[in-house]
Amino acid sequence: MRFIQTIKNIFKIEDLRARLIYTLSIILIYRLGKYVSLPGVDPSQLGQLKSQTSSGIMGLLDMFSGGAFSQASIFALGIMPYISASIVVQLLGIVFPYFQKLQKEGESGRRKMNQYTRYLTVGILILQAPTYLVNLHAQLPATAFVISGTFFTISSVIILTAGTIFVMWLGEKITDKGIGNGISLIIMIGIIARLPQNFVFEVGVRMNGAGGLIGLIVEIVFLFVVILGTILLVQGTRRVPVQYARRIVGNKQYGGVRQYIPLKVNAAGVMPIIFAQAIMMLPVIIAGYAQNGSGFMVAFSNMYGFWYNLVTAILIILFTYFYTAITINPVQMAEDMKKNGGFIPGIKPGRKTVEFLDSIMSRITLPGSFFLAIVAILPSVAVQATVSPQFAQFYGGTTLLILVGVILDTLQQIESHLLMRHYDGLMKSGRVKGRSGATTSI
């Protein structure tokens, strides 16, 4: 009853209701674009392309585009070129002083960074669109192309580039006038769109003898446990207490209260998995071009093999430490605390505070990196346990982390709208308590 009442409260708030309707409308436009094929391609002959993109790297690309990749759609390249550009610009902000300065300039700097990201996205699209067209020609018969030659190539590159830019614009509109982060929501919708189809396929496989009903129930229970573990990973924090000095200005008293710095167990997010998979793509690509590849190369090109997943897990652990080190700055945190009259009880301000924060991050990053590596290779483990590759994608990796992260973020935004207007929220927070000052939010 409480949940039903909360849903009613959502639609009572005019601003929240308008934002939800706007978000759903944008999502509908995005989903409809999937069914608009590139001019010059016969949609009735796309069956072979769909079969080639049902699993593996192509399957991931198709899932992140919501199935548009296998439909030769105007949105076939999806939002991933923009994500790639965002990652590159973010890394530039770590390496080059000019971009570091932009990051510290507030709103004006953010606008410039966004503009550079858009320019880089167009550059990536100009390179990626012809590659996609080459793949189309390789997978489809010649009769699938009503138009061919230079005109088809140039027009398709322009349309694919415009399609991704339009999807970017839709995401920004959701962020500005809707609910949640628009780009993240578009990726999530693309993933969820494949879930019903892949689940029905898995049910069919099980019901036709491979494990039966019992096997299907075990799969669902295990998936539920994995989702709970991923929520703990995404939400897990170590809260560091910070005491602020008491100040009296006129007749008012400021400070004197204890607050907390929430240090996330998985501060690196999904980035280590993306970096590791990008590196592990090289053996797959090389093995694809080499006709007589060595046993070493063949072993590392098998996405579901032992060696591939072992190296992937090691890379994820290393990248988790690397990315956490460049995104979490204990020196800056200690300086900010000192400027605002704050200190950690029992720890001297300055260098001791930096060392204390650094030691905490090292301790919580270790289990976080191992759990992230486990989540990343779970789809391969699921495939080895006879789960179909299509459905196994939902057992972990970037797929599950994105789903859990975006859903929780969107629910928290809706929750904040409800609480601002004195309504009960959607979620009840719980805490797994550890030592003093250390909790894991659920």
List PLM regions with ranges.
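N-terminal cationic and glycine-rich segments that engage phosphates or anionic surfaces
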Residues: 1-103, 108-442
